[in-house]
């Protein structure tokens, strides 16, 4: 990425699985403001510190906030994990300025890993990983589970699609591993068969 991590590409695909929501959002907000194009996948597996019951109570309090005279004017309450992440990042960006709006427009977030991103290399952000930032034994909950509790209706669908994608990826991985094994055997056999010719060429200093 641009700011300090040493990676800079036209588009970075971030696997959000087991990343802390706030830390991930703050890092991505800075990257977006630096001009980096970011795609976030598997938003339903983002972690939030605190148990599910406490997080659900906090979100239900947020859902009660509305404009009395015209509730459709806001605040808008998103239920999907990708939109919750998008709104969190929006709060860390001056999105009402041209620079902030342009930065926010370069962010894309998805539940699961839709094509073509299932065939692209995905990266993680160590500074936002749960295993490095959350104390052992501390309670946490998944954003997808929270979204399901507050009205997101696609949790089961995304889970089923992810299981199918993982099974397909495993078959593809086993096939590639088998082909690599056959290729290495073919190289060893060719080296044995060509050993006399190679010795002759070496003696001629070719």
Curated annotation (Swiss-Prot):
GO molecular function: mRNA binding; structural constituent of ribosome
A GO cellular component annotation in the UniProt record: cytosolic large ribosomal subunit
Entry annotated with the keyword Ribonucleoprotein: yes
Top-level taxonomic group: Eukaryota
Keyword entries, A-Z: Ribonucleoprotein, Ribosomal protein
Classification via PROSITE patterns: RIBOSOMAL_L13
One of the GO biological process terms: translation
Signal peptide: none
Similarity comment text for this entry: Belongs to the universal ribosomal protein uL13 family.
Protein name per its UniProtKB record: Large ribosomal subunit protein uL13
Gene from which the chain derives: RPL13A
């Amino acid at each position: 990425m641009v700011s300090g991590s040493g990676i800079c590409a036209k588009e970075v695909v971030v696997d959000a699985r087991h990343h802390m929501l706030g830390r991930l959002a703050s890092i991505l907000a800075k990257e977006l403001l630096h001009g980096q194009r970011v795609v976030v996948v598997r938003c339903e597996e983002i972690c939030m510190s605190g148990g599910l019951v406490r997080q659900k109570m906090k979100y239900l309090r947020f859902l009660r906030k509305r404009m009395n005279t015209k509730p459709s004017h806001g605040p808008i309450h998103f239920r999907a994990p990708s939109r919750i992440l998008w709104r969190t990042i929006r709060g860390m960006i001056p999105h009402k300025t041209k620079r902030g709006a342009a930065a926010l427009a370069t962010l894309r977030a998805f539940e699961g890993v839709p094509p073509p991103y299932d065939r692209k290399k995905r990266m993680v952000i160590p500074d936002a990983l749960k295993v490095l930032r959350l104390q052992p034994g501390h309670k946490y909950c998944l954003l997808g589970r929270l979204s399901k509790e507050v009205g997101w209706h696609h949790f089961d669908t995304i889970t089923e699609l992810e299981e199918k994608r993982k099974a397909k990826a495993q078959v593809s991985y086993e096939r590639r591993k088998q082909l690599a094994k056959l290729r290495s055997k073919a190289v060893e056999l060719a080296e044995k068969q060509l050993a006399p010719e190679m010795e002759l060429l070496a003696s001629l200093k070719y």
